[in-house]
Amino acid sequence: MLAILDYKAGNQTSVRRALDHLGIPCVITADPEVIQGAAGVIFPGVGAAGQAMNELVTTGLDEVLRRQVQAGRPLLGICVGCQIMLDYSQENDTKALGIIPGECRLFNPAWTDEDGAPIRVPHMGWNHIVQRRPCELLKGIEPEAEFYFVHSYYPAPPEEYVIATCTYGAEFCAIHGGPGLWAVQFHPEKSGRPGLRLLANFHRYCTEAADAQ
């Protein structure tokens, strides 16, 4: 079973619908015992980084997530969840979880697209990613696959944590982390077949990791 973290800055219902479609057992929960007993945790997020961190700290879920990582249990951050897994976000001058090194930065409105026009912020719509290193999440997903993005800020971890990039005015990190600890800037639950495959890959990894214990 996968646990979807329940706090006031997430799009938990959309994630659950995607997992239900795949036939993957899941529960939306803020219960630390349920989270600890899950094969893996999905950490979605929408809205502002500061608000999301406030909710996590107020409920104590920030420490629950840190313990999840310290115990080596799989975690997948989505959108704002992806951003606040880093040390810091420029949005609201937010001290974040510090699970993965790096910071989250605002898109530069002076950047231009391939036609020379200034980019619009937020980055909203479908875009393809470029895989930079092997990743279990991307197994079986075509290189030309597109994912759905909605964000004004982008993650900027150290190069060794960058798994895939996307280009919007400039190249930015679209997936970061490492085995069992991943963060995706796009919304897999809204990305059609490629997004569903990514979620299925995460579940498979979690199941295999749990069976190996």
Curated annotation (Swiss-Prot):
GO cellular component: cytoplasm
GO BP terms, alphabetized: L-histidine biosynthetic process
Keywords attached to this entry: Amino-acid biosynthesis, Cytoplasm, Glutamine amidotransferase, Histidine biosynthesis, Hydrolase, Lyase
UniProt entry tagged with the keyword Lyase: yes
Catalytic activity: 5-[(5-phospho-1-deoxy-D-ribulos-1-ylimino)methylamino]-1-(5-phospho-beta-D-ribosyl)imidazole-4-carboxamide + L-glutamine = D-erythro-1-(imidazol-4-yl)glycerol 3-phosphate + 5-amino-1-(5-phospho-beta-D-ribosyl)imidazole-4-carboxamide + L-glutamate + H(+); L-glutamine + H2O = L-glutamate + NH4(+)
InterPro entries linked to this entry: Class_I_gatase-like, GATASE, Imidazole-glycPsynth_HisH
Active site, per annotation: C79, H187, E189
Highest taxon of the lineage: Bacteria
Glutamine amidotransferase type-1 domain segment(s): 1-212
Compartment(s) where it occurs, according to its Swiss-Prot or TrEMBL record: Cytoplasm
Gene3D superfamilies, per the entry: 3.40.50.880
Chain's role: IGPS catalyzes the conversion of PRFAR and glutamine to IGP, AICAR and glutamate. The HisH subunit catalyzes the hydrolysis of glutamine to glutamate and ammonia as part of the synthesis of IGP and AICAR. The resulting ammonia molecule is channeled to the active site of HisF.
Keyword Ubl conjugation: no
Pfam families named among the record's database cross-references: GATase
Location, primary (coarse class): cytoplasm
GO molecular function: glutaminase activity; imidazoleglycerol-phosphate synthase activity; lyase activity
PANTHER family according to UniProt: IMIDAZOLE GLYCEROL PHOSPHATE SYNTHASE SUBUNIT HISH
EC assignment: 4.3.2.10, 3.5.1.2
CDD domains hit by this protein: GATase1_IGP_Synthase
Listed name of the protein: Imidazole glycerol phosphate synthase subunit HisH
Pathway: Amino-acid biosynthesis; L-histidine biosynthesis; L-histidine from 5-phospho-alpha-D-ribose 1-diphosphate: step 5/9
